[in-house]
Amino acid sequence: MNLILLDRDGVINYDSDQFIKSPEEWKPIPGSLEAIARLCQADYRVVVATNQSGVGRGLFDMYTLNAIHDKMHKAVAQAGGRIDAIFFCPHAADANCSCRKPKSGMMEDIATRYNTNLKGVPAVGDSLRDLTAAARMGAQPILVLTGKGAKTQAAGDLPEDTLIYPDLAAVVAMLVE
């Protein structure tokens, strides 16, 4: 089984400092949906791992988060792909939960669900917390320069062996070719 972990905001869709609070605000980054379809055609199981603290902050509710994810699922399917699962942390940063990236709880849940360790599994993100959570589990951290990725790269201090690509489409081209 080929598994790949993708952050959502800034990797699949455009991010916003004001959060993605409705399905209308969810807009895919050009090439990302087709990239997910290519992964599926290459027999990858695509798993989204995303912090969604807007729920914990009261900016939107679970119904709205599910509607956003439903829109994403439909858009990916329309492009010929499939997201196997979405794991998310709904807690605000001050909740001190174990599932919020950069902590490893969400990644541990994914490993348990798929009955595997994540050693070497590609984990694509645009923030240091995405890359740190991946590295803690032995996954391969991959930074994309979309979303907050360029700022993350400029700030430095990336986990050892982090790969850097312009966007998800470039990551997928590297993986499947």
Feature locations, PLM:
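Active-site neighborhood of HAD-like aspartate-dependent phosphohydrolases
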Residues: 1-47
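Short acidic, glycine/proline-rich loop/turn micro-motifs
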Residues: 16-20, 58-59, 154-155
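Short phosphate-binding/catalytic loops that engage adenosine nucleotides
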Residues: 44, 81, 139
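Acidic, Mg2+-coordinating phosphoryl-transfer loop and its flanking beta/alpha structural elements
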Residues: 123-166
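Structural recognition of alpha->loop->beta junctions
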Residues: 69-85, 154-176
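Short, electropositive alpha-helical surface patch
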Residues: 58-73, 98-110
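Conserved Lys-Pro-Asp/Glu-containing loop-to-beta segment of HAD-superfamily phosphomonoesterases
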Residues: 98-131
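Substrate-recognition element of Asp-dependent hydrolases with the DxDx(T/V) motif
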Residues: 32, 36-69, 84-95, 134
